[in-house]
């Protein structure tokens, strides 16, 4: 029997309707559109496409987007000065840094100039610390989207055993913390985990965030388990696959996100949700 498909496109569409209504209400309260500022260094085509998609999404929901494109040769001081100006600008409600930064630029230095109240990626040390303490403010968008998929599709988390494969500061670790705060028993797996399959076969929920195409095979999956696949791996033929062997896993799992069309569409919408949170919190409304 095939697994239930956790369709991120369908969920994202429902969320867009909800967020558009919230932004309309917010605009009435503050007499303007909430503004997101996106800082991009260089003009990498993939990064540019992503930034344009954020611009289109923002405008479609009634928010405004300002894109600041800095040259590849920008210095650390110039980049930090740009972020400082945006942090101090009362007309900007949230800031998104297009990552990763080019080699030679320090993310830590840039984050030191970003006020946590405007950190739409949820990666500022203060926001990371609040999440670790169980007092989340602005949460990284990708794991927030994963939790939203679990919630909206009514996947039980409390009391379940969950494994997160991947320990990045932006996806793996925050996802593990969110699952822990939802009362799951969580194991974090990584490149040094011995016998990954033995760990995963004990788990009711598997979160794949390793960045390795089709790392997780059907033999590693407990029958009926729920799989959230954050992997976005482009193969030599141009096709995109996740970190899970979807074609085989769909015959074993109870529920699974496809790639593409699973976690990706929800991630971008979570960015707008963070913009609304940031605006309300900063303006005290």
From Swiss-Prot:
GO cellular component: cytosol
Example of a GO MF term: methylenetetrahydrofolate dehydrogenase (NADP+) activity
SUPFAM superfamilies: Aminoacid dehydrogenase-like, N-terminal domain, NAD(P)-binding Rossmann-fold domains
Coiled coil feature spans: none
Binding residues for NADP(+): 166-168, 191, 232
Pathway(s) it belongs to: One-carbon metabolism; tetrahydrofolate interconversion
Keywords: Amino-acid biosynthesis, Histidine biosynthesis, Hydrolase, Methionine biosynthesis, Multifunctional enzyme, NADP, One-carbon metabolism, Oxidoreductase, Purine biosynthesis
GO biological process: L-histidine biosynthetic process; methionine biosynthetic process; purine nucleotide biosynthetic process; tetrahydrofolate interconversion
Reaction it catalyzes: (6R)-5,10-methylene-5,6,7,8-tetrahydrofolate + NADP(+) = (6R)-5,10-methenyltetrahydrofolate + NADPH; (6R)-5,10-methenyltetrahydrofolate + H2O = (6R)-10-formyltetrahydrofolate + H(+)
Chain ranges passing through the membrane: none
Protein EC: 1.5.1.5, 3.5.4.9
Keyword match DNA-binding: no
Record-linked PANTHER family: C-1-TETRAHYDROFOLATE SYNTHASE, CYTOPLASMIC, C-1-TETRAHYDROFOLATE SYNTHASE, CYTOPLASMIC-RELATED
Role noted for this protein: Catalyzes the oxidation of 5,10-methylenetetrahydrofolate to 5,10-methenyltetrahydrofolate and then the hydrolysis of 5,10-methenyltetrahydrofolate to 10-formyltetrahydrofolate.
Record note on quaternary structure: Homodimer.
Family (UniProt): Belongs to the tetrahydrofolate dehydrogenase/cyclohydrolase family.
Annotated protein name in UniProt: Bifunctional protein FolD
Organism: Chloroflexus aggregans (strain MD-66 / DSM 9485)
């Amino acid at each position: 029997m095939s697994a239930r498909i956790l369709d991120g496109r369908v969920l994202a569409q429902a969320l867009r309707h909800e967020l558009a209504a919230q932004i309309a209400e917010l605009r009435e309260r503050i007499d303007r559109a909430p503004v997101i500022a996106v800082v991009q260094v260089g003009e990498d085509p993939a990064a540019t496409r992503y930034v344009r998609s954020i611009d289109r999404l923002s405008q479609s929901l009634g928010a405004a987007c300002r894109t600041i494109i800095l040259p590849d040769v920008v210095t650390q001081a110039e980049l930090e000065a740009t972020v400082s100006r945006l942090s101090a600008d009362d007309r900007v409600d949230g800031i998104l840094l297009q990552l990763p930064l080019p080699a030679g630029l320090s993310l830590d230095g840039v984050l030191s100039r970003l006020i946590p109240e405007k950190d739409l990626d949820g990666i500022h040390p203060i926001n990371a610390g609040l999440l670790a303490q169980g007092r989340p403010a602005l949460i990284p968008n990708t794991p927030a989207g994963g939790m939203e998929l679990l919630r909206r599709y009514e996947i039980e988390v409390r009391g379940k055993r969950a494994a997160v494969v991947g320990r990045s500061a932006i996806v793996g670790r925050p996802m593990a913390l969110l699952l822990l705060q939802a009362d799951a028993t969580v194991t974090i797996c990584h490149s040094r985990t011995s016998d990954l399959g033995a760990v995963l076969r004990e788990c009711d929920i598997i979160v794949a965030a390793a960045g390795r195409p089709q790392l997780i095979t059907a033999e590693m999956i407990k029958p009926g388990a729920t799989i959230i696949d954050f992997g976005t791996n482009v193969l030599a033929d141009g096709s995109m696959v996740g970190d899970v062997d979807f074609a085989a896993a769909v015959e074993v799992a109870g529920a699974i996100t496809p790639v593409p069309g699973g976690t990706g569409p929800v991630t971008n919408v979570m960015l707008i949700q963070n913009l609304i949170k940031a605006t309300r919190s900063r303006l005290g409304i």
